Amino acid sequence: MTAPTVPADQHGHPLPGPADPAANDTWRPSRYREPLHPDNEEVLEQAAYQAAVTRSSGDDRKRKIKPRRTVDYQGGVQKWRMLNKLKGVHEFRPAIHPNPSDIVNFLPPVALRSNPSTSICDYWVHTSINKERSPTRVVRWTPDARRLLTGNDKGQFTLWNGASFNYESITQVHDDSIRSFTYSHNGQALVSADKGGTIKYFTPHLTNIHGFQGHREACHDVSWSPNDERFVTCGDDGLVKIWSYREAKEERSLSGHGWDVRCVDWHPTKGLIVSGSKDMLVKFWDPRTGKDLSTLHSSKSTINTCRWSPDGHLVATAGQDSVIRLFDIRTFRELEVLKGHEKEVNCIEWHPIHHSLLVSGDALGTINYFSLLSPTPSTPITTLSAAHEDAVFSLSFHPLGHILCSGSKDFTARFWCRARPPGGQEFDKWHLTEEGAAQKELERITKREWGTNALPANAAGGGGGGGGGDKQQVALPGLSNLVAAVNSVKTGPTTTGGGPPGLPGLGAPNVHAGTPPSRVSTPSSMGPPGAGAQGQAQGGQFPRGRAALPSQNDMLRHNHGPRGGFADRDRNGGGDRGGMDRDRDSRGGRQDPRGNQMYGRGPGGPPPGPPPGQGGYNYPPAPPNYPPYPPSSYPPPPNNQPGYPPAPNYAMPPGPGAPPQSYPYNRPPQGPPQNNNPGGQGNYGASASGGYGQYGGGGGGGGGGGYGRDGRR
């Protein structure tokens, strides 16, 4: 075959003509003269979509790539095999310390048969949410343990990866809600039942090969015989039926329950069937004869689930009474009652390796672990209080026992693995709920920052009448920068006599913290005279009642004076608060023994002046129509009390160190009342704005007055 000729002119140059089609072809063979296969349409569409998303506005920010959690058991299995081969001692196990580097010594549960506590799966790994928003009724691991199969209320099977827990596929298999499905022991068959009573056969690849109507009403549970030739089902028609798998034919119908049968399970090695019903009975059946062997009447409510232990000696039942009951089939007696749930228990699962470990889920979303080897087997050893937001319907352990999967009414399937060597998972939101975890985190931060487990109550100042602050001086969040500023200001004497000053508006720390106050009728302002805040801090008492509100005339008459100072309250440690506002101005006084008249600004108050018998002071002469005052039962203040020297008469002008002035009831209208300044000592009744109350441990001496001078000494 000759090469094609190219037209040329007389000089041999090629004539202009159409372009060479090979010149526009960008493809050239690179190896063995075989062209590369072009991308298919799906790849091109994905590339175009990604380019469009990148060019779109508002998506220029960098996306944070989060790696998916993966639980790989191959490392632990290989480590265990290596130890058995190299050490030559089958029971040799390396010690595991609370250090992240010791995770390499984490062996599978089969290598730690003598320690069931290592197989508690309470560490959250992943939450898988089905594309179809429907409750997850059943969860089961596939026989090869590489995937997890879930069934929901819409009749769909969903496959999840068993290592990375990502979604793989979804298949519509039933027309109604899937209530139960289980794999055969050899892993070659799958039988499922739905709410309509339909039973279907599937291959391991989820291919439907047969289906028939098994019960007239909903079918709730399915269980295989030990040799995989038969399986048993139960339903709301009150019957327990035994079926031949190969013939898809009913062999025997067991009747004896008086209501819906909610659960059934075949013994793992023997010809024995257990069933639980809504009639509160647990029955044991002989599958060969169909007779009722025994009936247990321990439960007082509906039986929701029943499961044989892997060794076949125990059977666990649970229901609406929120407890799990263990029975020994060798005696047909109740062995133990496991408590710890607050709502009805919906599912039970035994650990495949550690047969003394039991896990259960209830209608509140709680998952509890019980150990029969525990000193107190009736109480859970681990509780996941907030494992799900709604009821837990199904639980399933990985065949190796290192992962637990739970299905719930909140449309999710959650995966839990064993705790890692550092620990700390017991303080997360799954164990303590959101509020408990936040409180625990706050305590941890508080302990790290201030060296204490929690912020002491009233650490920065005392309340009314009770003890002041704690002995330990603790900085307050957000106010620690004010300490230097407060220390640089002269704040005057404190209750501790030279102790650290308090923060503005928060009181002063009180080192004399005593017994807590008691609520009795004796007012706190009637403590030991002269003790002030210190005396009340060691045993102060709260006033029980409040005086009656003053009349409108009294309020208008006493409203002209300014209120007392607030700086003294900040230094008043544990003293009682005086009348800081107009509606509290009767708390600082005490009740008149003759009735409802109050010392202070209460209506119908006593004549002015201090009570008799204190520091040599006497009452002024009472009006003719006013009954005499009873003698005081309180001891006088100590002699030479600072700030209160005895006075020979009441004619002294007001000022520092002067006793209160007295006025008769019908005082002259001319001129304002004396000692009305906010810095002086308040009187009873007339001086509504006195700065310091003379009597009581920090109480407001005069109506809306400030805080007691005695409370600061």
From Swiss-Prot:
PROSITE patterns: WD_REPEATS_2, WD_REPEATS_REGION
Region entry Disordered, spans: 1-37, 448-474, 490-713
Renumbered ranges of WD repeats: 131-170, 173-213, 214-253, 256-295, 298-337, 340-380, 387-426
Biased composition (Basic and acidic residues): 566-593
Pfam family for this entry, one: WD40
Record bears the keyword Repeat: yes
Entry's Gene Ontology cellular component terms: mRNA cleavage and polyadenylation specificity factor complex
Biased composition, class Low complexity, residue ranges: 534-548
Principal subcellular localisation of the protein: nucleus
SUPFAM superfamilies: WD40 repeat-like
SMART domains named among the record's database cross-references: WD40 (SM00320)
Keywords: Chromosome partition, mRNA processing, Nucleus, Repeat, WD repeat
Extent of Gly residues compositional bias: 460-470, 679-713
Gene Ontology BP term (one): chromosome segregation
Biased composition (Pro residues): 604-613, 620-672
Gene3D superfamilies in the record: YVTN repeat-like/Quinoprotein amine dehydrogenase
Subcellular localization: Nucleus
Function text: Required for 3'-end cleavage and polyadenylation of pre-mRNAs. Also involved in chromosome segregation where it has a role in chromosome attachment to the mitotic spindle.
Name of the protein described by the UniProt record: Polyadenylation factor subunit 2
Originating organism: Cryptococcus neoformans var. neoformans serotype D (strain B-3501A) (Filobasidiella neoformans)
